[in-house]
């Protein structure tokens, strides 16, 4: 898999290594009985040897002529012994870096590696991915040649159908691919080619969700001026068909926003009408459409075998619309069964499936035979939906006003009772203070009376003594 930049360490001059590689190719081609590569390049290598010995500036055009012959014959490397394939390709990659434009040779090498390695049927894909990864990592991050190498890696993974190899590539697709696309400065056609290659590999590896993502990204590369072309139509039909049949795709906004998909309104009107039904309509409209227009007759029968999948998805979308539009936030089982055309005993199954799809949230009440809606996804948001939101906001406002009124009443009652309690406490405190004052006065009065009584008694006692 692509990793940090790698450097190949191979000793020898260009002429020496080219001659050695030519001999190796001749050994692999000996059964063909053709002219040897070494004999063809020897006249071209002689002046290069002289330049290397005199430390003169090498003739790049001369090197390119040598490389053309070597690369043209290099397809035979796929027949090399398993233990020699990687080292042989590494030597060829090293030689290609001497070219004036390595890209014109690397794209051809990638095409060789995308073909089966006949000498190792079991490990051929792993060997090819290893070699391509080495090539990728020897190139600078901004080198546009990486584009062709990356396409080669993706092609090998797609052809092998290896889930393990694709899973190893996925982190790079998420973390690095956007940066690579920017640094490689691809045009719309190249970007579309890359996204479609990734989509094909994801589909082969059993990842339809990632495949759908890259199909949409490929669709977005189509310029508005080319939206009505045959290529754009084919891609739009593929993207639309994939989205309609994918069990986890319920948002069709990216499709309706595409110029290429909008162009289907003229070229494939029935398919576009079906998209509009899935975007905003219900099961009733879908069944009426299918009755009038059999799926087998839409755009060459691309949806001929998708009847059950489309109907099931339409049921989920219909339930989402019901949940979003009900003002009471409560859906009786009978209403759901009638709208989805299912038996009453299957209602809970369809509600659970819709919850799993992320379209609604809520609680099933078996006792009351109803679905209590907590959240519902709006499939489209227009004037009707704004009116529903306004109505619900008014209901919430009235509810909040009632709550606020209750809170105010309770607050006033609390304040009133608090004041009354404080006043009662103050009166009680004053009463206790008065009682203490009265008791203290009585004690002082009794003490004074006792003293006066004693004073009156003393003269009498003195008189008696006299």
Swiss-Prot record:
Subcellular location: Cytoplasm
A Pfam match: PCI
Example GO biological process: formation of cytoplasmic translation initiation complex
Domain PCI: 211-378
Biased composition (Low complexity): 451-460
Transmembrane segments: none
MF (Gene Ontology): translation initiation factor activity
UniProt keywords, alphabetically: Cytoplasm, Initiation factor, Protein biosynthesis
Region (Disordered): 40-62, 424-466
Origin: domain of life: Eukaryota
Family: Belongs to the eIF-3 subunit M family.
HAMAP family: eIF3m (MF_03012)
GO CC annotation, single: eukaryotic translation initiation factor 3 complex, eIF3m
Name under which the protein is recorded: Eukaryotic translation initiation factor 3 subunit M
Function: Component of the eukaryotic translation initiation factor 3 (eIF-3) complex, which is involved in protein synthesis of a specialized repertoire of mRNAs and, together with other initiation factors, stimulates binding of mRNA and methionyl-tRNAi to the 40S ribosome. The eIF-3 complex specifically targets and initiates translation of a subset of mRNAs involved in cell proliferation.
Quaternary structure, from the entry: Component of the eukaryotic translation initiation factor 3 (eIF-3) complex.
Alphabetized InterPro entries for the sequence: COPS7/eIF3m (IPR045237), eIF3m (IPR027528), eIF3m_C_helix (IPR040750), PCI_dom (IPR000717)
Start-end of Basic and acidic residues biased regions: 433-443
